[in-house]
Swiss-Prot record:
Gene Ontology biological-process entries: protein catabolic process; proteolysis
Role, per record: Involved in the modulation of the specificity of the ClpAP-mediated ATP-dependent protein degradation.
Protein name stated in the entry: ATP-dependent Clp protease adapter protein ClpS
Family the entry assigns: Belongs to the ClpS family.
Source domain of life: Bacteria
Length: 111
């Protein structure tokens, strides 16, 4: 129920009669850009051999041969693959290492 108050201009304003009180705070977990992981993306290029890309994934990122080949095939067939993810500093370091090895690597935030 609302109380009505008439102003000097004849306008009726309403306001709540009682304000409900919250006994406990409600916490909402909102996904913000600060807590989303970063991803290292390797892009297909016309320069590097498939065997070399697989080799780089093994030596630079530490993947076994099977996983390195799966990621290399994803790059080859889909044009790109997310090859690592995590905190920004770690992914940034992975991107730099892959670029030094001659691969086309970028980073982006998940989401």
């Amino acid at each position: 129920m609302k109380a009505h108050k008439e102003t000097s201009a004849g306008v009726v304003m309403s306001s709540p009669m009682a304000t409900p009180e919250l006994d406990e705070a409600i916490e909402v977990d909102v996904a913000t850009s600060e807590n989303l992981p970063w991803m290292c993306i390797v892009w297909d290029d016309p320069v590097n051999l498939m065997s070399y890309v697989s080799y780089v994934f093994q030596t630079v990122l530490g993947y076994d041969k099977k996983r390195a080949n799966e990621l290399m095939m994803q790059v080859h067939t889909e044009g790109k693959a997310a090859v690592s993810s995590g905190e920004r500093d770690k992914v940034e370091a992975d991107v730099k290492k892959l670029q030094v090895a001659g691969l086309w690597a970028t980073m982006q935030q998940a989401g």
